[in-house]
Amino acid sequence: MATLHFSINGRAFTVDADPQTTLLTVLREHLDLTGTKYGCGEGQCGACTVLIDGKAQRSCVTRAAAVGQRQITTIEGLARGDQLHPVQQAFLDEGALQCGYCTSGMIMSAVALLDRNHHPTQSEIVGFMDGNICRCGTYSRVIRAIQKVANEQVVTGTAKAVGR
């Protein structure tokens, strides 16, 4: 066991865990942040996606000890009080969820995409989201939701504010 220190969703956490434990295990089992889902356990499906220093990463294959000094954002860290993050709201508006299992990973990947590319083409969206699998087949709605946020950024001039 080791004492691990984290910055998650803007808050400091200390956890006693095996350094080889995955970030996903720390989030779900030690910190009760269950919005991040376990899918495949191999980094292939995207259900466990979180942001580490603003980049989409698979938490099921990320060792907790490797991210101690980095900024981690989970799905729980996106909304501000009762106000959903623009990507969360767009997913809701466009019906880009069914069973909901992949939704948090999809949203986290979409946030990472829009933070680095404020106006992605449909092809860029499809390419970036390729690592996120949806068993229910909501891909066209996911693309529409991401395009909606990108288009609203153009209208409102909030491109730099999408991550928060």
Residue ranges and their predicted role:
Residues M1-R164:
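Signature of N-terminal electron-transfer/Fe-S-associated modules in redox systems
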